[in-house]
Structures are given as structure tokens and as C-alpha cells.
Amino acid sequence: MLKCKQPGARFIHGAVHLPSGQIVFHTIHSPTLASALGLPGENVPIPALFRASGLNVRESLPMTNMRAPIISLARLILAPNPYILEGQLTVGMTQDNGIPVLFARPVIEVKSGPESNIKASSQLMIAEDSCLNQIAPFSASEHPAFSMVESVKRVRVDEGANTRRTIRDILEIPVTVLSSLQLSPTKSILKKAPEPPPPEPQATFDATPYARIFYDIGRQVPKLGNAPAAQVSNVLIANRSHNSLRLVPNPDLLPLQHLYLKHVVLKSLNLENIVQDFEAIFTSPSDTISEAETKAFEKLVEQAKNTVENIVFCLNSICSTSTLPDVVPDVNNPNISLALEKYFLMFPPSGTIMRNVRFATPIVRLLCQGAELGTMAQFLGKYIKVKKETGMYTLVKLYYLLRI
């Protein structure tokens, strides 16, 4: 942890602002979140995420905000248990004497359990001003206003019980206690091994290693008590709340198999997914599958990927049209309508949301049933102008549809 004892330092939008104008903050490595916020590269400054919420917050950001769907997306990406809605992203704390303390890593705090580190990697940075100009990695040794603190014990009062309080003294153990000793410069006698070269990127995604779990899902249902509780909870909640679209027209597949297919597609796109949760649950490597089953699974993954890409292409044209023809609501597919309502809240269309939902629902239904993109583009061309460009935020749109 970092404690800033410089007078006037304070938290604003998740960053410690110094009187000199400099700010110290975390950056989160997440290509999906960076794309959603319209940021270049793969890193997200915490202040950018806090500002996107529209809330006047300091060191903690609630991870649920109906007016800012981007926060729900951030919760799915960052929280180890993303379906606990009352969590908040916390980067530090302000002591009673006004001194800000910045955590080494952002954490997710929940009322019903212990705090946990975010899933994405992070790094402390410093910028010359609040516009995030001249960003550089932060080093406490170069900024005497900050001191390293081993641990800071915090008190959480349960107002619901309202019976007693447990007060613990704040414990500060400076790491730099040896700095006052007169030690001669030392030099390591160990030879550093050369760093291994970075692995070459794969040209294509190999879905073969994930086929076994797909067929295991068809043979057993995960239950609490038979597998790690956190992973089972994540998978079951995702299956119930974030599995609206059936991208493969195969009635024999279980809903959980549809969910797994979508997360394998996310992994193939190098986007955040819960494939590791499935791997923790279905741990029976002795089960063997045939080559025909493996090829069938690879075909399903490719089909799901093509379907969601086709949906994004059609929705781009629908969103850009200010006046859509009115159609009768599709009452037979409420899951698709609800998914599209969430999608249009995240990516607002030119017209009204409900008119877009009514028009897009049968289009998405036909695409999920296997309709060709060329056929659907010709059909759309009779009513609206079809955009041939993919536009911005394609990856995050794919991510959002696969997680709805």
C-alpha cells in the first residue's frame, strides 16, 4: 500500500490528486474494457472508468449502475464473482486524518464476503495532470511524498446488527526502516538467466482441447458440493442470467452447452471468459472423445462465432437508422427481446429503443436459426440502408452479445 502524507492530497475519481497537479492511479489491462470506453491500446486508467459511471465518487465505485451499462460490463470483466451485484471497485481508503492510502491493486468489496483482487492485471502509474498526459510507471522511491505501508487494517461496522463495534488500531509497518542504516553498496553474485523469447502468436484458434468439457456437460449437471463452490455458482448464474441467445440451431444441446460454446468463442477472440470455471468443474480427463465428435464441436464453435458476427453486422445497420418501419412485437421470443433491450441500452440506437427491439428481434431470431447473412442483408435492404462498414467497438459488441 502507498500512503501519501503530502498536505492537500486527496482521492478524486479513483486517483490520488497531489497539490502539484500530478495524479497517481492504477491502470487495468483489459482490451475489452478499453474498447468499450473508446480508449486506444489495451490499458484502462481507473479515472476513465470512474468518470464513465457519471457518479461523483472518490476511492470506491459501485459496480451496478442502471444509468451506466458500462459499469455492468466492467463488473463482468473484473469481478471474480461478477453476479454479486452489491460489490464495489475500491482502489484505496482515506484515513480519519484525511491521509489517502492507495492499495497496491484494486479490489472488489462485497457486503456478504471478503474482498478480492480484480481478475485483470494492474499497474500503478503517475500522470502530470488530470488529463492523463505524460503517463509513466510510478515508483515510490522517486516520490518522497509517498511511503510504502505493509498493511492497513480497516474496520467494517455491521449496521444491521447495531449491537457493538470492533475497533482495531491502524497498523503501519514502513518498509523503508532499513534506509537509515549505513550499508555499503552490494552487488548480486547470481547470474541472471536470459529472459525467454515471447511466444509466437497462434495464427488460428484450436478448439480441440475444449471439446471434452462440451460433451461432459451433456452427461452431468454441475452441483454445489461436487465441485468448487465459486466456479459452480458462476457457471449456474451465468446460465440463468446471461444465456439469452441460442446461437446454434440444435435443439438437442443443453442450455449449459450453449453457454460453454459462447465462452469458447470469447476465448478464441482473446476476450474475458469463464472457460476456466468450466475446467475447474469438469475434471475428468480420462473421458475420451472420437475424432468425429471433436470435429463436430469445432464446427459448432465456428457456427456460433459466425452467427454472433452476423448479428453485430445487422444490428449496426439497424442502430444507424433513425426511422424504422413499425412491426408487430414478437411475443414468442422474450429472451431475444430482453437481450436486445440490454444491447441497445449499451449501444444506443438513432431511434427509440423499443422500436429497434421490435424490428431487430425477428432478424436476430432468423440468424440464430441459421439464416445466411447475404439473405438477411437483402431483406434489410428493402427497409433500411445496410452499412457495409463494421464501425467502432466491434469486439466489445461481440463480447456483450456473448455475455447477455
UniProtKB/Swiss-Prot annotation:
Family: Belongs to the lymphocryptovirus BTRF1 family.
Listed name of the protein: Uncharacterized protein BTRF1
Pfam families: Herpes_BTRF1
Taxonomic superkingdom: Viruses
